[in-house]
């Protein structure tokens, strides 16, 4: 997400993976103490409170800082009701310590007729200045629900003009699974069943 914006365990008995993820988030306040640990983890080691990833899962505490970009072959879909706003097998995800991945979609795979430039901007130390987008699919209008980097820093040139969206406010899917939003309301990470935390944005995580 725009970094400065203010706006499990593989158990096969778990039938609803997103419900299990929600339970992870609720546990964060019990597992982490920001005053003890602070922000000193950058992907080289996991903090004591990090959940152990199961088979086929990733820990967000193994992601680097500064973040890196990774290509995604799974289908990514963003929709408003019955209208598919974006659909692609060529997305990228940005991986940063403690946060679930943020997915960016090529502009050519987003329906421009529903996009309107919104006011304001924010700045990320890694990616540059984010511009915001409103989605209008009458009668639904979602203000500042997406963002893009139109002139990113050189390391993020590959996502120039690509769009990401807040899954807390618009329906997002990866590989056929509905995405869950990063906790806290400040961030735009996409939580899928193959990613474990705890995640930045939950209670007790402001020092991460």
Q: Could you say what each language-model-derived stretch is?
A:
Residues 3-208:
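Terminal leader/tail segments of proteins
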């Amino acid at each position: 997400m725009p970094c400065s914006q203010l706006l499990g365990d593989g158990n096969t008995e778990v039938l609803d993976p997103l419900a299990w993820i929600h339970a992870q988030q609720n546990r964060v306040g019990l597992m982490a103490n920001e005053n003890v640990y602070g922000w000193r983890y950058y992907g080289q080691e996991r903090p004591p409170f990090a959940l152990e990833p199961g088979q086929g899962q990733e820990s967000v505490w193994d992601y680097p800082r500064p973040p890196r970009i990774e290509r995604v072959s799974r289908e990514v879909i963003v929709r408003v009701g019955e209208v598919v706003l974006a659909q692609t097998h060529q997305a990228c995800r940005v991986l940063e310590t403690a946060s679930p991945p943020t997915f960016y979609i090529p502009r050519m795979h987003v329906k421009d007729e529903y996009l309107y430039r919104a006011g304001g901007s924010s700045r990320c130390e890694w990616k540059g200045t984010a511009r915001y987008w409103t989605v209008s699919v009458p009668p639904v209008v979602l203000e500042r629900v997406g963002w893009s980097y139109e002139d990113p820093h050189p390391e993020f040139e590959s996502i120039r003009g690509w769009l990401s969206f807040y899954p807390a406010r618009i329906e997002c899917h990866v590989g056929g699974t509905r995405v869950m939003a990063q906790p806290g309301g400040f961030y735009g990470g996409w939580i899928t069943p193959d990613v474990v935390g705890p995640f930045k944005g939950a209670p007790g995580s402001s020092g991460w």
